[in-house]
Amino acid sequence: MAAARAAALGVRWLQRTTRGVVPLEARRAFHMTKDMLPGSYPRTPEERAAAAKKYNMRVEDYEPYPDDGMGYGDYPMLPNRSQHERDPWYQWDHSELRMNWGEPIHWDLDMYIRNRVDTSPTPVSWDVMCKHLFGFVAFMVFMFWVGHVFPSYQPVGPKQYPYNNLYLERGGDPTKEPEPVVHYDI
């Protein structure tokens, strides 16, 4: 009982002392402001124009996510392209992400940054890549089959041991003289 009371008093004391150290608004500094959050789904052309202006887009280019209950609201549906596809020599405001200030961010930006998914077109088409892969696999299977049918072994001599072919260690009679063993130099 006394330990629980002491713990409760210690927690209250810690809360009182940290109030003076930590600024009051520090806990709110990481939240998104209301104007950063997506608004409701635009139903009229005027709402679409206002949402396009909010995201620094032309009305012709603005297309919101479908209103399917996922909570996207008026956020623009940007093309699913990675940051790799953007011009690396352009003077971006944020060169690591290849983005400019005020530019709308893709909803799945964490998936399309440069060290994740690369959606840029490949220089070789898929059918050519598949032909190369299956050709290599077929060649390797053929080579393994040839190695299995026609085995190749290097000729070897009998195993050579030092000290007269380990005569005593292999159970030889210590009273008899072992036969001399000829060792071959390679």
Curated annotation (Swiss-Prot):
Primary location group: mitochondrion
Pfam families: NDUF_B8
Membrane-crossing segments per the record: 133-153
Biological process according to GO: aerobic respiration; mitochondrial electron transport, NADH to ubiquinone; proton motive force-driven mitochondrial ATP synthesis
GO cellular component entries: mitochondrial inner membrane; mitochondrion; respiratory chain complex I
Entry keyword set: Electron transport, Membrane, Mitochondrion, Mitochondrion inner membrane, Respiratory chain, Transit peptide, Transmembrane, Transmembrane helix, Transport
Domain of life per record: Eukaryota
Membrane topology category: Single-pass membrane protein
Subunit structure: Complex I is composed of 45 different subunits.
PANTHER family, A to Z: NADH DEHYDROGENASE [UBIQUINONE] 1 BETA SUBCOMPLEX SUBUNIT 8, MITOCHONDRIAL, NADH-UBIQUINONE OXIDOREDUCTASE ASHI SUBUNIT
Function: Accessory subunit of the mitochondrial membrane respiratory chain NADH dehydrogenase (Complex I), that is believed not to be involved in catalysis. Complex I functions in the transfer of electrons from NADH to the respiratory chain. The immediate electron acceptor for the enzyme is believed to be ubiquinone.
Assigned protein family: Belongs to the complex I NDUFB8 subunit family.
Protein name according to UniProt: NADH dehydrogenase [ubiquinone] 1 beta subcomplex subunit 8, mitochondrial
Lineage, top ranks: Eukaryota, Metazoa, Chordata, Craniata, Vertebrata
Recorded name of the encoding gene: Ndufb8
